[in-house]
UniProtKB/Swiss-Prot annotation:
It holds the Pfam family SDF. The chain crosses the membrane at residues 9-29, 45-65, 79-99, 149-169, 185-205, 223-243, 308-328, 356-376. The gene is dctA. It comes from Burkholderia multivorans (strain ATCC 17616 / 249). It is found in: Cell inner membrane. Coiled coil: none annotated. This is C4-dicarboxylate transport protein. The lineage of its organism: Bacteria, Pseudomonadati, Pseudomonadota, Betaproteobacteria, Burkholderiales. One of its GO terms (biological process) is L-aspartate transmembrane transport. The keyword Membrane applies. Belongs to the dicarboxylate/amino acid:cation symporter (DAACS) (TC 2.A.23) family. It is a multi-pass membrane protein. It comes from the Bacteria. Responsible for the transport of dicarboxylates such as succinate, fumarate, and malate from the periplasm across the membrane.
C-alpha cells in the first residue's frame, strides 16, 4: 500500500496547527482569542456523536454475550483496576510535591487572597455528595440523558437495553442488527469530523495562548514542570509496568494512539478523542463488549491525570501559604480525593471544579488558595487529559486480557504499525 505524503498524515497536520496557534496567540493575541469558536465547534461535533456511539457499542457488545454474568464480572474487574491505579496516581502526586516542593518560597498570606475569581468553581462543587453523584447516574428520561450528553446515564440505559436484547435472543436480532449498522454509520461520521481536528486544535491553542499569554506561566513554572514530570513518570513507570506485565510496550501503545493524543493536546478535552480511542482499541484486539464497558466508565472513574493534579495542587497551595499538614490530614486528603475525583469528566475545567470540591472538605487549606493556580490551570489541563486518555486505553487492554478477550496477534500487529494501515483502510468511510 502506497504511503501517504507526510503533509496528509493527520497527526502531522495537528502538530502544525498547534504550532501556528501558539505563534498567532503570542504575536496577535486579540485576533487569536477570536479563534475560540473553531476549537469549541470541533469539540461540539465530536460530543454530538459520543452518546450514540457509547450506547450502540455497549448494546451490541452486551447483546452478543452468552453469559450475562460476564457484564458484572467485567464491570467489577474494571472498577477494581480503577481504584488500584487511581490510588497510585494520588499517592504519586503527593510524593512528588513533597520531594520537589514547588510551593515553598511563595510565603503568601491566605488573608490577602481574593476568592471571588474562583467563586463560580466553588459553587459548582458545593454539595456534591456521594449520594448526589449516584442519583445523578439515573436520568430523568432516556431522551434527557442523550440531550445532556451524560455519559454515565447513557451507559446505564445501554446496559439495561443490551441486557434485555440478550435475554430476547433471536427475537431481538432485528433490533441488534439495526444498532450494529447504526454503529458503523456513527463511526463513519467520526472519520469525517476527525479530518477537521487540525482546525479545532489551531483554534483552541490560539485562544489559550492569546488569552492567558506565555508570560502567565513564568511564576509557576516549577509547579507546571513538577506536574508534567510526575505525569510522564506515572505513564512510563506505573502504566509501563502494568503494560509490560500484560505483554505490551507502553511506548508503542502511546505511539499507536498518537493522533488521538494530539487531538487531546490541541483541545484539552479527552472527550474529543473518545470515539476514535474506542475504535482504535477494537482494532488492537480488545473485544467490543469490554471496550464499550471500560472506556465510558473510565471517563468518570479512571482519571489518572486528574488524580495526580488533585493531591499535587492541594499540597502546593498548602506549601505556598505555609500551612503544615499532618500525615493524618494528608491521608484524609487521599480518601476525599478518591471520592471527589469520580465526579470529574473529560471536559476542560472539570479538574478545577473537582479541586474545589476536595478543598471544601479539607478546611485547613483556604478555598481562596485556588486563585494561585487559576491562571495556569488551562495549561495543566492538557497534561491531565493526555494522562487520562492513556490510562483509559491501558485499562481497556488490561481488562480485555483478564477476560481472555484480547487478540494478541492483532495487538502486536497494531503496535508494530498495523494501526496506520487500519486507519488508512477506514479513511474512505
Amino acid at each position: 500500500m502506497k504511503k501517504k505524503p507526510f503533509y496528509k498524515v493527520l497527526y502531522v497536520q495537528v502538530i502544525f496547527a498547534i504550532v501556528v496557534g501558539v505563534i498567532l496567540g503570542h504575536y496577535y493575541p486579540s485576533l487569536a482569542t477570536e479563534m475560540k469558536p473553531l476549537g469549541d465547534g470541533f469539540i461540539k461535533l465530536i460530543k454530538m456523536v459520543i452518546g450514540p456511539i457509547i450506547f450502540c457499542t455497549v448494546v451490541t457488545g452486551i447483546a452478543g454475550m452468552e453469559d450475562m454474568k460476564k457484564v458484572g464480572r467485567v464491570g467489577g474487574k474494571a472498577l477494581l483496576y480503577f481504584e488500584i491505579v487511581s490510588t497510585f496516581a494520588l499517592v504519586l502526586g503527593l510524593a512528588a510535591t513533597h520531594i520537589l516542593r514547588p510551593g515553598v518560597g511563595f510565603n503568601i498570606d491566605p488573608a490577602t487572597l481574593d476568592g471571588k475569581a474562583v467563586a463560580s468553581y466553588a459553587a459548582k462543587a458545593h454539595g456534591q455528595s456521594t449520594v448526589d453523584f449516584l442519583m445523578h447516574i439515573i436520568p430523568n428520561t432516556m431522551v434527557d440523558a442523550f440531550a445532556q450528553g451524560e455519559i454515565l446515564q447513557i451507559l446505564l440505559i445501554a446496559l439495561l437495553f443490551g441486557s434485555v436484547l440478550a435475554h430476547l435472543g433471536e427475537r431481538g436480532k432485528v433490533v441488534t442488527d439495526f444498532i450494529d449498522g447504526l454503529t458503523r454509520v456513527l463511526f463513519g461520521i467520526v472519520h469525517i469530523v476527525t479530518k477537521l481536528a487540525p482546525i479545532g486544535a489551531f483554534g483552541a491553542m490560539a485562544f489559550t495562548i492569546g488569552k492567558y499569554g506565555v508570560g502567565s506561566l513564568v511564576p509557576l513554572l516549577k509547579l507546571i514542570g513538577t506536574f508534567y514530570l510526575t505525569s510522564v513518570v506515572f505513564v512510563l513507570v506505573v502504566l509501563g509496568a502494568i503494560a509490560r506485565f500484560t505483554g505490551f510496550s507502553i511506548i508503542r501503545f502511546v505511539s499507536y494512539i498518537k493522533e488521538e493524543l494530539l487531538i487531546v493536546l490541541g483541545t484539552s478535552s479527552s472527550e474529543a478523542a473518545l470515539p476514535q480511542l474506542m475504535e482504535k482499541l477494537e482494532k488492537a484486539g480488545c473485544s467490543r463488549s469490554v471496550v464499550g464497558l471500560v472506556v465510558p466508565t473510565g471517563y468518570s472513574f479512571n482519571l489518572d491525570g486528574t488524580n495526580i493534579y488533585m493531591t499535587m495542587a492541594v499540597l502546593f497551595i498548602a506549601q505556598a501559604t505555609n500551612i503544615e499538614l499532618t500525615w493524618m490530614q494528608q491521608l484524609t486528603l487521599l480518601a476525599v480525593a478518591m471520592l471527589t475525583s469520580k465526579g470529574a469528566s473529560g471536559v476542560t475545567g472539570a479538574g478545577f471544579i473537582t479541586l474545589a470540591a476536595t478543598l471544601a472538605v479539607v478546611p485547613t487549606i483556604p478555598l481562596s488558595g485556588m486563585v494561585l493556580i487559576l491562571g495556569i490551570d488551562r495549561f495543566m489541563s492538557e497534561c491531565r487529559a493526555l494522562t487520562n486518555i492513556v490510562g483509559n486505553g491501558v485499562a481497556t487492554v488490561v481488562v480485555s486480557a483478564w477476560e481472555k478477550e484480547l487478540d494478541r496477534a492483532k495487538l502486536r500487529q497494531a503496535l508494530k504499525g498495523g494501526g496506520e494501515v487500519a486507519a488508512t483502510e477506514t479513511a474512505g468511510v
